[in-house]
Amino acid sequence: MTADGRGRIDAAFRGRLGRFVLDASLSVPATGVTAIFGPSGCGKTTIARCIAGLQRLSDGFCAIDGEIWQDGMAFRPAHRRPVGYVFQEPSLFPHLSVRGNLLYGAPKAAATSIGFDEVVELLGLTALLGRSPHRLSGGERQRVAIGRALLSQPRLLLMDEPLAALDRTTKNEILPFLERLHERLSLPVLYISHDMAEIERFADYLVLMERGRVVGAGPLHILQSDPALPLAYSRDAAVSIDGLVEAYDERYGLLTLAVNGGLLHVPSHRIAVGARQRLRIAASDVSIVRARPSESSILNILPARIVTQSPPGAGEVTIVLGLDSDGSGAPILSRISSRSRDLLGLSDGMAVFAQVKGVSLVRASGCAIGNMGPTAPGQLDHCSTQDTGVRSEAGTTAMPIDFAEIDPNRVAAILYRPQDDLDTLLADFAQDLVRAGERIGGIVQRNIKDGSGCQVGMQAIDLMTGREISICQPLGSGAMACKLDAAGLADASVAVASAIAQDVDLIVINKFSKQEAAGRGLRDELAGAIAAGIPVLTAVPEKCFEAWISFTGGIGTTLLCERQVIEAWWRDTSSRMKRMREDHDAVVAQCIEISGALPLVQRVVARQLVVTHDLPLDPERAEAEVVVRGVVERTNVEVLDGAADEADEAPDAGFPVGPERIERLPDIGPVPRRHEALQVEREVLSPDACLQRSAGERVDVFKEGKTKVGTVLVDRGDAELVEGPIVLELHEGAPVLVEMNVGVDLQTLYEIAVRGRVAGAERRCAIGLEAFAQRRPQRDVAFRIGGPKRDVFEPVKRFGTQPGIGKDRPVLCPAVRLDRRPLGDRSVLGPREPDAGAKGRKRQNDPEVAHIAPCQHRRTSPHLASARDALFGPREWISATYPPGNMTNAADRLLDV
């Protein structure tokens, strides 16, 4: 190959593979990211395998930067080609740790273009190095696969749809890392995808393929606006162009960016002057006028010239515009009606003005848009949104949420369209902050209804004090009809307006629903809050995620963890079960990582997932809060022996709790030094007898079989076992509160562990929810107890089913005996194991082990385990697993911990 081929990737392959015929040739720069785009089955993967040497065609040519790898005379095998290949499904060695997988393909030579530490830092793998692949989420495994490919010191990186098998949440986790690779490494990348949204974020060059042939190749923005190619006429037609930051207007929150052909003003946070930004201008956001308007709300009005027009179709026409008066600037697209074109008399070569109504910052340096705040150790500070979607016409201003600067007493938490009073997503969020020891003024809105059930107004409750406050004003008697969505919208609108008027530091709203996505609901109120400089924290259903991004520009923090989305996954028990489990694990793992990255919000805003931190206990007043069905109960907990002398040590960094939290709890009596065994004795042993119990009936609870300490409340519906809790209610001062639940497709037994910590022991205790779908209609319930030298996993014995009461509906109705036993430096509550004399059961009779009836072993979800271990350390945790029958109640019980 001559010097003419230097700086290029040249490839040409012809051949037949079964019925598929490949006849493709390309010549692209050997720098930056070149995307190969096309529909499934067009030959993208085949041409990548040919370049890598994994597929050999007799008629082929391949040269990289002037070095020939294949021609008619020679063929360099795959193992001798310096290519890093990242497949759709990451293939990691299961017997090696993350560190071992990364170093496996690294060359032995000392000279390297990219080092181990640099790869670990770029991809955020520090916290994962000691883990096994089965304990990684899908996104984490793919990041490890990318790191292993980079450490092989390749001259070319091939990425074959690396995000195709991932859900949107996990894609958004990985894309910022790919952007960092693009910005910091000079390595050429061939990126294969059929998703234009991925390509628009970081690709420089584009190759279009169709039916085994290359139909176009060139710079991304040129091909997007080429009237001879289908991209310009697609429904989501847009052009991606790069601009340089020239200035920032602090007053209006506007960036001024210079593009080829003029200046664009885009709402954004502050970005350094000279930084390069990727902009996306959709054809539907560009209108055309013959003369510059003197008065208009549209900020971006640029001189342009019509390059060409598409033939009219379906009443619309796509027009290619060249910015600048002579049309020599960057090309953009405009989609208008055929009638508008005729009324304006538009023709090729005509000078016009382009009104750009909306501009999206596809990739913003600084990563403030959508950033989750300060990062946890081992995590990268990166953007988490796919498209900031900042809209000029909306007047929104993108900004990060800096939790360090937020006054905890100036946070408005608004419960929008509540379904179960305080038993809702936002209530859980605010109460989590209270239980975690955070000093935050959570405000929850509640609807006020008259005797007929019609809504007549609102009230707001401060979750910290329980007092009613006046942030929301009543709307007047009879103002709303009952069961109308408009009522909830109007109430929430008043609440948002009141929060804006009081100039709060943060607005927390529990959902962004389909009404906002359709252009109704709280769009105006939220836009007003954003315009006033108040960040918004919300939970967004995945189906509304794009609408949220387009509307708000990713303002603040978006968590894809809404309860309804998860529950919808669990309701489907068809062949999609395996995929649902993977999706749920990925979402939950993502949420755990997010929660670990926030110093203020220690737990994820989601009902189906809870991650708790241990509380340092004061030896003079050790108390724990337990919330059951929205009611806060406070009970004493035991101070473990040996902790009294060391409990004054500071708590772990990043978890600001201490004596001030203890001091504001009411005095409920002395702290017991030791727990005594508790027994729950019930004479009801069979499902038939269980069904005969009446709702509200109570069964006595005795201590050591003699002293009555409480009752079991039987709250049962009808003979079909409608869900209802059975609660062990203890008198004031009793050490433990336990709840069980009986319901359709739900068998639940859980423990509330004393969350203590012996200072210096470097142990943590956390209780988290692990729920995953299985094909069996019955589910096992299990506890897992881990320590530095012991790892016990003994599921609770499966309960039987009652014929004729629905299909395979489990019945939890045997006699239950609970006792409390010490376990190292913590106490664990669980079913008592019958004595066994066999030597083989010595481990079960160990007094330091929580005795649980043995049953079939079941592994813990690797995604959840890996994410949990990143926060709390491996094996230093306690957790409970639940079936998918009713995720809401299962999560509620763990929220109570």
From Swiss-Prot:
Keyword Cell cycle: no
Positions of region (Disordered): 823-848
Keywords recorded for this protein, A-Z: ATP-binding, Cell inner membrane, Cell membrane, Membrane, Molybdenum, Nucleotide-binding, Translocase, Transport
Membrane topology, from the record: Peripheral membrane protein
Residues reported to bind ATP: G38, P39, S40, G41, C42, G43, K44, T45
ABC transporter domain residues: 6-236
Function: Part of the ABC transporter complex ModABC involved in molybdenum import. Responsible for energy coupling to the transport system.
Subunit relationships: The complex is composed of two ATP-binding proteins (ModC), two transmembrane proteins (ModB) and a solute-binding protein (ModA).
Name listed for the protein in its UniProt record: Molybdenum import ATP-binding protein ModC 2
UniProt source species: Bradyrhizobium diazoefficiens (strain JCM 10833 / BCRC 13528 / IAM 13628 / NBRC 14792 / USDA 110)
